[in-house]
Amino acid sequence: MNGRVDYLVTEEEINLTRGPSGLGFNIVGGTDQQYVSNDSGIYVSRIKEDGAAAQDGRLQEGDKILSVNGQDLKNLLHQDAVDLFRNAGCAVSLRVQHRLPVQNGPIVHRGEGEPSGVPVAMVLLPVFALTMVAVWAFVRYRKQL
């Protein structure tokens, strides 16, 4: 194992309507406050409960915000990015990059309503077999006495 984590990177357009508490998330990053080594991008650090982003459900902590209302966030100071969000208006369009860790090994898709975990029969069958062996050994031992 090389210790490296692989990611599946996807982009998504998310439209939010500013609520009473703003857009409902905090950001980190910028050219003066790099959040990720060698990356001056702007990242979501926290989703506020009951905020616009939480109600929408698509924006996640750790997502990289690429643009706000079509304006690129590359090479911005942190405060300039904050100001851009604050002045974006009520209807805000975000271009977001999600990074999902790639699972090693096969991916198993379960059907809806299908239980997860180990089936009961997989547990009970070995227990039943061991019980039968113990009973057989006990009966055989008693016959020898």
Curated annotation (Swiss-Prot):
Lineage: Eukaryota, Metazoa, Chordata, Craniata, Vertebrata
Source organism of the structure: Mus musculus (Mouse)
GO MF annotation terms: type II activin receptor binding
Main location: mitochondrion
Annotated protein name in UniProt: Synaptojanin-2-binding protein
UniProt keywords, alphabetically: Cytoplasm, Endocytosis, Membrane, Mitochondrion, Mitochondrion outer membrane, Signal-anchor, Transmembrane, Transmembrane helix
Compartment(s): Mitochondrion outer membrane; Cytoplasm, Perinuclear region
Residue ranges of domain PDZ in the record: 13-100
Induction: Up-regulated between 12 and 24 hours after treatment with activin A and lipopolysaccharide (LPS). Down-regulated by calcium ionophore A23187.
CDD domains (alphabetical): PDZ_SYNJ2BP-like (cd06709)
The keyword Transmembrane appears for this protein: yes
Keyword Oxidoreductase annotated: no
Disulfide bonds: none
SUPFAM superfamilies: PDZ domain-like
InterPro entries per UniProt: PDZ (IPR001478), PDZ_sf (IPR036034), Synaptic_Scaffolding_LAP-MAGUK (IPR050614)
Tissue and organ expression note: Isoform 1 and isoform 2 are widely expressed, notably in brain, heart, lung, liver, kidney, skeletal muscle, ovary and testis. Isoform 3 is detected only in heart, spleen and testis.
Cytoplasmic compartment spans: 1-117
Any GO BP annotation: negative regulation of angiogenesis
Topological domains annotated Mitochondrial intermembrane: 139-145
